[in-house]
Amino acid sequence: MQKDYQKLIVYLCDFLEKEVQKKGFKKVVYGLSGGLDSAVVGVLCQKVFKENAHALLMPSSVSMPESRTDALNLCEKFSIPYTEYSIAPYDKIFGSHFKDASLTRKGNFCARLRMAFLYDYSLKSDSLVIGTSNKSERMLGYGTLFGDLACAINPIGELFKTEVYELAYYLNIPKKILNKPPSADLFVGQSDEKDLGYPYSVIDPLLKDIEALFQTKPIHLETLIQLGYAEILVKNIISRIQKNAFKLELPTIAKRFNPE
């Protein structure tokens, strides 16, 4: 197991180096939240680009103070250059203008604010934006379109959340980050498990079977139930996948019109 993950680290570092170079960049930037996924991406980027990998810390008005502390501790441990921009003034303005906004709307606004800061920094510093969404999130559509899902390159987009945990262990990510419940930290009390209804330890095996069995054909409910998955779980996950599949697609553009 250790040997496999050491090989994976080498593979992902090589991927980052080659893909960034292909796009004509020497520097990268990414959002560092204090959570697991961005910590893993941050350490991978630091291994490859050293001082040319820059983290942006962008706490909102509802971010947990410990998220910022965990991000700062990671930067200190791995000598990661960072800049901190508070998005609190902007999300407060949104809240004052849209007092009836749901938590999802407020969360999406914060996610898109962060991506705006990342791409502004990208332009200012001639850096490429690196993504931090894992495969579980991507398959479920558990992310904000043109928010945290937006990036030029994503080294962990084909790793399920449970695999990111294992990779983090071999990258020596602090236990404080490894052990805390996953959360997008977009509103008070939020957690991935509350949003999704299940922990990743339950979701990921199902996602792996869905990918293996139904890559080129429609997902079949009964087949998955016969494998031992609870019907309510399967229905919930299939619904999320189908409802949010558009988030992984490029915009649909009308074909050029050729009048006869």
Curated annotation (Swiss-Prot):
Keywords from the named record: ATP-binding, Ligase, Magnesium, Metal-binding, NAD, Nucleotide-binding
Q: GO: which molecular function terms?
A: ATP binding; glutaminase activity; metal ion binding; NAD+ synthase (glutamine-hydrolyzing) activity; NAD+ synthase activity
Query: Per the record, what are the reactions this protein catalyses?
Result: deamido-NAD(+) + NH4(+) + ATP = AMP + diphosphate + NAD(+) + H(+)
**Main EC class of this protein?**
ligase
Q: Which GO terms describe its biological process?
A: NAD biosynthetic process
Keyword Coiled coil in record: no
Q: Which domain of life is it from?
A: Bacteria
Which pathway or pathways does this protein act in? Cofactor biosynthesis; NAD(+) biosynthesis; NAD(+) from deamido-NAD(+) (ammonia route): step 1/1
The positions annotated for binding deamido-NAD(+) are 112
The record's SUPFAM superfamilies line, in alphabetical order, gives: Adenine nucleotide alpha hydrolases-like
**Residue sites binding ATP per the record:** 31-38, 132, 161, 183
State its Enzyme Commission number(s). 6.3.1.5
Assigned GO CC terms = cytoplasm
**What InterPro entries does the record point to?**
NAD/GMP_synthase, NAD_synthase, NH(3)-dep_NAD(+)_synth, Rossmann-like_a/b/a_fold
UniProt-annotated binding residues for Mg(2+): 37, 137
Q: Any idea what job this protein has? A: Catalyzes the ATP-dependent amidation of deamido-NAD to form NAD. Uses ammonia as a nitrogen source.
By its UniProt entry, which NCBIfam families does this protein fall under? nadE (TIGR00552), PRK13980.1 (NF010587)
Q: How is the quaternary structure described? A: Homodimer.
The entry assigns this protein to a family as follows:
Belongs to the NAD synthetase family.
Protein name as catalogued:
NH(3)-dependent NAD(+) synthetase
